[in-house]
Amino acid sequence: MAELAGYVWLVVVGAFVAFGFGWGTGANDVANAFGTSVGSKTLTLRQAVIIASIFEFAGALLLGRVSTNTIASGIADITSFTREPEVYAYGMVCALGVGTIWLIITSYYGLNVSSTHTIIGGIIGFALVWDGGDAVMWAKRDPGSFPPYKGVISIVLSWFISPLLTAAVAALIFFIVRTCVLRQRNAYTLAFWTLPPFVLITVFINMFFVFTKGAKKTLSRDSNWSDSKAAWISVIVAVCAALLCICVALPLLKKMADRHFDHNGNRITPIVPRGDYNIHPEEPLSSWQKFKKAATHGVDVDIHNIVKTDDKIGDIHDAAEKFEERVEYAFSYLQVFSAICVIFAHGAGEVGYMAGPLATIWDVYQKGQLSKNVTPPVWIILICAVGLVIGLATYGYNVTQAMGVKLAKLTPTRGFAAELSTALVIMIASQYGLPTSSSQCITGAIIGVGLLEGAKGVNWNQFLKQFASWVSTLLVIGLAVAAVFSQGVYAPSKIQGKEVIMYEDRVANLTTGIYKDFNANLQSYKSNSDALLLPTLPPTTWADLNTTVTSAATKTKNLVDPKVTQTTDVDQILGSLYQSLSLLQNYTIFTLGQSTVFPGAQACIDPAVANSSTAACRSPTLLPKELMK
């Protein structure tokens, strides 16, 4: 049975908002990953959804079920939640719920934000409410990373480091491809020579990233596993992929290219036979057809139409340098392969961490504590992965259009340079502790290839909106989660109310029992006190004690009687307990000792029979007999 069975609602609500967050991530973060491929017309939205369905699931289920630290590590000090882990779980529910709404809003406006930063912003929000500014790790020294700080400062730095690094790398890669291949007279032949090396590099980067990040925790159970071993295995896999490309992929690609293009590189237009055209009246759609049309709307949107309707975007695309279409066609298959690697690595490296909030909620519910490491169950991975795919399929077109069409002109060669540079920068940065974000990296990469067309090759208005959305994510999410979390933690709670009443009743009953036992002992000393045989317990002291005990017992009983007192302060309950313990400490034979109370006699026995009695005086008890077993 779960330790916190009363909080099963957190798991239920958490599962729903986790699915919603996965949906929002699919519409925003995963759509961003496919933006270059769809924007360059290498893939259609429908094809991107199919690839995501297969390889996102494969990466998540095969290599994504890693044992992760709580997602707050490095951002917030969660030790303040250890006494009340259910509050932390509630905070995660708030973060997922608000994060879902934020991802929907930003997706609507075509703004690409980081889903990880969204959750982190939520954690910052409820941590501040719970324990103030000290609960957040703003800038903590970490000699193992560069810059040598971790915490919120690393996120701020990623806004600048991520796009700048990938812009430089993407520009360099595309510059080399453009100079050495695209602008050469024999570009088509050179393209086939360059494809195997690019396949080798692409596979190595993505496999090394998967082995060192996505699957590291699983593979590290082998005591011989290390990053150097991961590098060698990645090299072997990459070489095999390159050989497979040479032996199988290139001949097939050459055959397909020759089928679509003539020897001069012009696309062969199929001849459409002329005939009679009959116009038929359009049949009304059935209910099923209407439902199908609505369900598939997200993959049928023409994201490239904006090039015709928006003059500024149209000018950017028209001004971009055009290359031989046949060469771009050859690179399109390399970009498809790169997109598959990217989405598989995303499933292996990101889905496991995305599942962190719901996994934490489930772990708290099961164990009643905050664990250092949490391994997401399969059902949690499935919830997140299904949400990702559905989000991409139903609402990913806005961000895909923004990243793949609005920001800069993309072609298969440009898109491949952007994807490869993103994977390369993330891999290198993760090894050296540089703060990066995949969302911000791909944005910088697209800008990098666009800048090779000059400053007018980039839609700077779109980029400024992007940058503003990165900055506002932490602020907006933090404030919104803080508001929702505050409403919950400062509102009356049925579950905690029952627990408080239980504690109050038990403490009050314990205190009343002590008073009752004390009073019984006090009555047994009355005759000796009246006879002035007890120097430490004269009649006046006995009377005062009797009055005090009787009054205190009645008062304690009334504290938990709703007919008398409806609201009880904790100090009143504990004050009564402390008073009873004080009386025991100062006025019982535990403290005074038998000989001090009445030397040579049983002080609690009537003097008339004291000489003939051997019975011992009763000793006061602190706990009821049923609790002493």
Stretch-by-stretch model annotation:
Residues 1-629:
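Alpha-helical transmembrane segments and immediately membrane-proximal extracytoplasmic
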